[in-house]
Amino acid sequence: MQPIIRYFSFDDVTASQGWDLLSWCRSHGADDFSLTALVSPVESGRMKAFFARLDVYSKSNAVRHQLAAAPGEAAQRDTRLWRLTEQTEAILRESWGVGFVSNEYDVDLWLEDLAVYRAGDLMMGVVSHENGGVLRLTELELSELRHSSFPDRDSIPWIGF
């Protein structure tokens, strides 16, 4: 069965709703994640500490769908992954102060473009600089999310799947 594709805008979602969405994805089978870290001009102590905490949960790189790609770069590409667990979710919450549904950045710990996978397939992902994300769900899951008042849209400019 083909998943239903829905979108969400950071304008409609609070940081708390974003974290609730991550927990919801984990409770519905999401098992790993990727993210992008920007380092300028050198890696900060906070960045090193963040990745040191995640290292315990790292998985082998695998080909995964990425929503953000440079011109000429494939959407399906080798991706650094971590297991999505209660512990890694807590690390993300503690470290990513503004949350992942924000286009605000912390220069010392500049994280963006969280992507969450279920059995290797993208379930939820954001493109931070485009102010939104995508969901790939079953009809029942979409109904459940809507019942929880999570705001979804038909489309978001510059984000597609």
List PLM regions with ranges.
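Structured alpha/beta or helical-core interaction and ligand-binding surfaces enriched in interleaved
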Residues: M1-F161
